[in-house]
């Protein structure tokens, strides 16, 4: 039976850590009848935070998916982490959502991770509501946060509710559209509220905001705009229709206030999910791509009768077994179906399908376009793989994940655990593409790489608790890069004669710095056949394979352009392998002449500190070679933004707590690579040589 997709909403809830996302999701589940006792995050018993590490730390690490119902609509809700080290979870969730709720703290306002998540949501063109939470907190200011959304995020909030009372006296909200006040009692029961007239002292404010709301909404419809300008009354249904259109187009973001912890205001946000966020048929269809990742011009149309197109967006091993969270874009997926994984070229039979509720599940027979479900027991699937109809194959646009910025060498504490460690790590890599594992060729050490200290800390925890492997960790290593600063024209001749046919290849070439972020580029300008065209790819391959190791400290070389200008060949002794060898030797010959340099990762660091500790915090950031970008004083303290080298930030959280008597907070995200100062570069090169000598 075909489902009515107009009654579906695939939504994500995302925010900065501690803005109250998971608590908001708990309230949604309570209100929609999914759970009967509310779990409090600060007590470590939240429904959505179901990994032990999450429950202990009070932060959401994995995006838990759950289905619930509100006003005859099915909501598939994904609760995402707010900590910067887990941004990958937010990114991959946004990839498969149709709409979202951005949760902001009423006192903290637009915080660092809010900005990152907002940018990702813009990139993914996800329609959003804004929910300003924690309005019962000291220092909470709804209007200030609305202004910050405009100035910091460059977004247009469409204010839909106004708070009644501030801080401790916050009791409810006014629905601007219906001009009704929702006032909750102090029992903490979300169902115990009354709908009354607007408080007398708010009548003028509500009228002003209502006029702004209607003016903004009717811009979506020329006929209604004309009626409005002529002084005609616009119906609430017409206004809602316009708000829905503008929300879907990302022209504005309906904005609500409340306190999830105190159970005030969440119902109106749920109503808005149904009223204004798009259903699966209202979002642009997913493009299909070829093997090179280029769009083919075909799209996965949201139709249960169309060929199957689905995206595996998360792999998770839980106590029930391996789960593959999947968004179905077109077609129908049923138990017993055979599907093709376009990434591996292998087919697999679907054993069981389940609809998830945090960490419990309900078996289902089939799922259709628009659904988010979990497949149990798939073998060779990874995040970003396309699952499709084997008779009508196609690949969806894959996910792109950021490179890790930190690495640590690990080894098992107990002997004989190497195999167990290897199996555990391969499973963890499958679940989290931003976590990488490799073996150091020289030392044979196992190296793990991730997005930050907390990211790797959690992985060590998972190894110990889930897989029973305790490890010793080395010192964190920074992912340095190398580049060149000068153009060099050079020639290399590879000649080898050892009886019989020899080897001969001559290349004339230019190595030069590329544009920042351009990676490795190769071009051939050979004319006249001195280097036959069939050997050009071999020259490119030789250089391409060489850039993984720089000449200063063995770090990968970035932003390098090589141009093959001329050369020579021998009709008998020349071969592709000879030209490849020439390119590799040419690389080693020319790079030292091109004034190479070490690049270090620079992090965008965002620090919050009470005002009386601001001097210490800024002085400390300067000592860490930080460049202060801005300082902003708010009611709760000062927010300092700075660019700081990653190598200077290890252990910063402990130092910040000491400086601020435990009241400071910070987050950081990779921003760019920049040349190291000479003294730092010399130290990096020295350490690299010592490591190589010890290996």
UniProtKB/Swiss-Prot annotation:
One cellular-component annotation, GO: cytoplasm
User: Which UniProt keywords are present, listed alphabetically?
Assistant: Cytoplasm, Elongation factor, GTP-binding, Nucleotide-binding, Protein biosynthesis
Task: Specify whether Repeat is a keyword of the entry.
Answer: no
Residue ranges of the TM segments: none
Asked if GTP-binding is a keyword of the record, the answer is: yes
In this protein, which residues make up the domain named tr-type G?
Answer: 6-281
GO molecular-function annotation terms? GTP binding; GTPase activity; translation elongation factor activity
| GO terms, biological process | ribosome disassembly
Please give the superkingdom of this protein's source: Bacteria
Subcellular localization is given as: Cytoplasm
Amino acids binding GTP: 15-22, 79-83, 133-136
Q: Which PROSITE patterns match?
A: G_TR_1, G_TR_2
Q: What HAMAP family does the entry give? A: EF_G_EF_2_B
The family annotation for this protein states: Belongs to the TRAFAC class translation factor GTPase superfamily. Classic translation factor GTPase family. EF-G/EF-2 subfamily.
Role noted for this protein:
Catalyzes the GTP-dependent ribosomal translocation step during translation elongation. During this step, the ribosome changes from the pre-translocational (PRE) to the post-translocational (POST) state as the newly formed A-site-bound peptidyl-tRNA and P-site-bound deacylated tRNA move to the P and E sites, respectively. Catalyzes the coordinated movement of the two tRNA molecules, the mRNA and conformational changes in the ribosome.
Question: What's the name of the protein?
Answer: Elongation factor G 1
Name the source organism: Synechocystis sp. (strain ATCC 27184 / PCC 6803 / Kazusa)
Q: What is the lineage of its organism?
A: Bacteria, Bacillati, Cyanobacteriota, Cyanophyceae, Synechococcales
């Amino acid at each position: 039976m075909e489902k009515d997709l107009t009654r579906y909403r695939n939504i994500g809830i995302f925010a900065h850590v501690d803005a109250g996302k998971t608590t908001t999701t708990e309230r949604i589940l309570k209100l929609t009848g999914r759970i009967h006792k509310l779990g409090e995050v600060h007590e470590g018993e939240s429904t959505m935070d179901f990994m032990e590490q999450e429950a202990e730390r009070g932060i959401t690490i994995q995006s838990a998916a759950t289905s619930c119902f509100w006003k005859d609509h099915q909501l598939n809700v994904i609760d995402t982490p707010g900590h910067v080290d887990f941004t990958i979870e937010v990114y991959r969730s946004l990839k498969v959502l149709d709409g979202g709720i951005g949760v902001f703290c009423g006192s903290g306002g637009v915080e660092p991770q809010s900005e990152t998540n907002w940018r990702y949501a813009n990139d993914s063109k996800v329609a959003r509501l804004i929910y300003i939470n924690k309005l019962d907190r000291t220092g909470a200011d709804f209007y200030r946060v609305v202004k910050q959304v405009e100035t910091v995020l460059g977004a247009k909030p469409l204010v839909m509710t106004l708070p009644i009372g501030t801080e401790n006296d916050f009791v409810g909200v006014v629905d601007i559209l219906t001009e009704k006040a929702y006032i909750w009692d102090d029992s903490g029961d979300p169902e115990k509220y009354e709908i009354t007239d607007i408080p007398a002292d708010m009548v003028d404010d509500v009228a002003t905001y209502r006029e702004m709301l209607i003016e903004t909404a009717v811009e979506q419809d020329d006929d209604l705009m004309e009626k409005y300008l002529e002084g005609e009354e616009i119906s609430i249904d017409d206004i809602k229709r316009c708000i829905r259109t503008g929300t879907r187009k990302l022209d504005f973001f309906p904005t609500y206030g409340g306190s999830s912890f105190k159970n005030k205001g969440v119902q109106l946000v749920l109503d808005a999910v149904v009223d204004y966020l798009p259903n699966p048929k209202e979002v642009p269809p997913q493009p299909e791509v070829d093997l090179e990742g280029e769009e083919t011009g075909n799209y996965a149309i949201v139709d249960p009768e169309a060929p199957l197109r689905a995206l595996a967006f998360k792999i998770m091993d839980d106590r029930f077994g391996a789960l593959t969270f999947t968004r179905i874009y077109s077609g129908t997926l049923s138990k017993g179906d055979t599907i093709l994984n376009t990434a591996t070229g292998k087919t697999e039979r679907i054993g069981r399908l389940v609809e998830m509720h945090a960490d419990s599940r309900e078996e289902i027979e089939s799922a259709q376009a628009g659904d988010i479900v979990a497949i149990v027991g798939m073998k060779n699937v990874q995040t970003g793989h396309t699952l499709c109809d084997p008779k009508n194959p196609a690949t969806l646009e894959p996910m792109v994940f950021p490179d890790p910025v930190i690495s640590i060498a690990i080894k098992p504490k107990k002997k004989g655990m190497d195999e167990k460690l290897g199996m555990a790590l391969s499973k963890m890599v499958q679940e989290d593409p931003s976590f990488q594992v490799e073996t150091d060729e020289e030392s044979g050490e196992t190296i793990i790489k991730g997005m930050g200290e907390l990211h790797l800390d959690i992985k060590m925890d998972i190894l110990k608790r889930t897989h029973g492997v305790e490890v010793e960790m080395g010192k964190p290593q920074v992912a340095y890069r190398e580049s060149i600063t000068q153009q060099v024209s050079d020639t290399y001749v590879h000649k080898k004669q050892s009886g019989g046919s020899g080897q001969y290849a001559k290349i004339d070439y230019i190595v030069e710095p590329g544009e920042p972020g351009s990676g490795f580029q190769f071009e051939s300008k050979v004319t006249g056949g001195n280097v036959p065209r069939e050997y050009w790819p071999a020259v490119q391959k030789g250089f391409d394979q060489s850039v993984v190791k720089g000449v200063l400290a063995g770090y990968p070389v970035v932003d390098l352009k090589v141009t093959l200008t001329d050369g020579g060949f021998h009709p008998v002794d020349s071969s592709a392998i000879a030209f490849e060898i020439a390119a590799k030797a040419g690389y080693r010959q020319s790079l030292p002449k091109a004034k190479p340099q070490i690049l270090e990762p620079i992090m965008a660091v965002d620090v919050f500190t009470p005002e009386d500790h601001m001097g210490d915090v800024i002085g400390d950031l300067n000592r860490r070679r930080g460049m202060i970008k801005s300082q902003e004083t708010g009611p709760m303290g000062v927010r300092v933004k700075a660019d700081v080298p990653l190598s200077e930030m290890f252990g910063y959280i402990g130092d910040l707590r000491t400086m601020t008597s435990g009241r400071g907070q910070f987050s950081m995200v990779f921003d760019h690579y920049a040349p190291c100062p000479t003294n730092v570069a010399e130290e990096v090169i020295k350490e690299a040589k010592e490591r190589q000598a010890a290996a």
